[in-house]
Regions:
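Conserved, structured core segments of small domains
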Residues: 1-112
Length: 112
């Protein structure tokens, strides 16, 4: 009998400016192209649920689907923005997406 995969959980990754963030340059002018491509790859794989920068250029938020925190830490560790030092992981926290506007799901949705 095939062993089933553990259910996917959600984790919020908070990013902050890293040591190689160029002061005085907004996020759109930082060397984050590889970071964006990496996030696209994670989205294609089904790991990334949503992501975006904070409007004050202090960092950003990524919501990942993963088996456990170790998997999320590995994904974040290999993010080119983190590897290059432009970004740094501030925290990783378990998250429960209770209200999802994209799917219309919520604890108050009518059962179908």
């Amino acid at each position: 009998m095939a062993q089933s995969q553990p259910p996917s959980k959600q984790y919020a990754v908070l990013l902050k400016r890293g040591p190689k963030w160029v002061a005085g340059k907004p996020a759109g002018e930082q060397a984050l192209g590889n970071h964006g491509r990496y996030l696209q790859e994670q989205m294609t794989k089904g790991a990334l649920q949503l992501a975006g920068p904070f409007l004050d250029d202090s960092g950003g938020l990524i919501l990942y689907n993963a088996r456990d925190e170790a998997e999320v830490r590995a994904i974040a560790k290999h993010d080119p923005g983190v590897v290059d030092g432009i970004l740094a992981v501030e925290s990783i926290r378990p998250f429960h997406l209770a209200f999802d506007a994209a799917s219309g799901k919520s604890p108050f949705s009518a059962a179908k």
